[in-house]
Amino acid sequence: MMKVLVVVALLVTLISYSSSEGIDDLEADELLSLMADEQTRKECIPKHHECTSNKHGCCRGNFFKYKCQCTTVVTQDGEQTERCFCGTPPHHKAAELVVGFGKKIFG
């Protein structure tokens, strides 16, 4: 009976040690992820700025991430080029308006 208790205690100790190592690894990975998110936030493209070269790099607005909206521009020479900027799509503007109105009514 004593041998069984020693083996169980040893197993519990090993399991708790391995799980604490896993938690430490998870915390380190989470910290790296948070640092990467902060770096991305610093490098994101603000609203109304050009995003032609990086169409997925727009920053987040109050509720939604800005979308890269593109238009075709025709120069005086007749040459067509695509120009893009970060902005809020109409359906996101409507949702923000409804949420803002709801906050004013319901506090």
From Swiss-Prot:
rRNA-binding as UniProt keyword: no
Q: Which residues form the propeptide?
A: 21-41
Q: Where in the cell is it found?
A: Secreted
Secretion signal: which residues? 1-20
Annotated tissue distribution: Expressed by the venom gland.
Task: List the GO cellular component terms.
Answer: extracellular region
Question: What GO MF terms are annotated?
Answer: toxin activity
- Is Nucleotide-binding given among the entry's keywords? no
Record's keyword terms, sorted: Disulfide bond, Knottin, Secreted, Signal, Toxin
Main localization is secreted
Which cystines does this chain contain? C44-C59, C51-C68, C58-C86, C70-C84
UniProt domain comment: The presence of a 'disulfide through disulfide knot' structurally defines this protein as a knottin.
Tell me its family. Answer: Belongs to the neurotoxin 19 (CSTX) family. 04 (U1-Lctx) subfamily.
- Protein name (Swiss-Prot/TrEMBL): U1-lycotoxin-Ls1b
